Amino acid sequence: MSLNTKQSDPINSILVKISIILFLLFSGWLLYDHFINRPLDVRYYLTANNAFKDKRYDISLDNYLKAYSYNPTDAYIIEGIARSYMELDDFENSLKYFNLAINTDQEFAPAYANLGVLYDKNKDYLNAIKFYEIALQIDQDLSVGMHWIDRLLYDVRTKPPTIMDRLFYLKDQMLLPEDKRILSIDEIDNEQINYEK
């Protein structure tokens, strides 16, 4: 049997055409479902996440609030609002939304971790320790910190301190006499990241 016979086989030609048509239909459906048929709260949430990662916190806050208007029971959306307020230095609103996220899902460890970061930024170290411990009790994976792939994608050249690192440091400092404590070092504190899941 020669190659020319295979190419002129009508069944082979029909099967190839059917395969191409099915591939195009399936790809079209996937694109439609992914981009067009996506619920509005998910669209706003993803836009907010991208803006947050690009450090455009006012845009992220606006989109998280839009997502929240469609889905007020999603802990991820609520916690995103709180993180945006935290980065915009609005302590009271950030605290309000972190507490709302925790009340919505009491097992959502990033809300506790980021609430600890909020207290840490505001120099309330005892509450920071408390919420870091709660976050680590719920999810030990938070002690690992930023994954190397994320560091590569977001061009983070040095490994930022984790909440476990910060927790140990704060606890060690609390053991010292008050006049010997160094609880805040701006260069290190500024490297501390927000936690996502």
What feature does the model see in each segment?
Residues 2-15, 144-197:
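Terminal, low-structured helical/coil segments at or just beyond the last alpha-helical repeat
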Residues 36-73, 80:
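Alpha-helical segment of the N-proximal tetratricopeptide repeat
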Residues 46, 80, 114, 148-149, ...:
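Canonical tetratricopeptide repeat
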Residues 53-54, 87, 121, 155, ...:
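Register position in tetratricopeptide repeats
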